[in-house]
Amino acid sequence: MWYQKTLTLSAKSRGFHLVTDEILNQLADMPRVNIGLLHLLLQHTSASLTLNENCDPTVRHDMERFFLRTVPDNGNYEHDYEGADDMPSHIKSSMLGTSLVLPVHKGRIQTGTWQGIWLGEHRIHGGSRRIIATLQGE
């Protein structure tokens, strides 16, 4: 059985955001599978998806500070005509990735107790973000 749906995440400020509930709420009509895989593909080149700490928001703040130091906006980038935050956003997106594959068991994603799905919004004004969710299972 295959199922696919386009999800839209609301616009977020620059930084890392816990979006597990926002994604799962949009997948409420997803067919229930006993065992399967859920693939999430973020359709953007200046944001990222990753799994990380879902409880303490300071982890997200520390992650953002790390990436701002590691890939600064004021770098000497050739690709700069879309703004000072654009090229660093592409780099961060490539470092973290834009897709996740999550196991599904009895209709629920099987993340660890402390794991949540994060959106890394790397633009100052990124806007809404689209995710293609594809479920395969039985």
Swiss-Prot record:
It comes from the Bacteria. Pfam families: UPF0047. InterPro entries: UPF0047_YjbQ-like (IPR001602), YjbQ-like_sf (IPR035917). PROSITE patterns: UPF0047. Belongs to the UPF0047 family. This is UPF0047 protein YjbQ. It comes from Escherichia coli (strain K12).
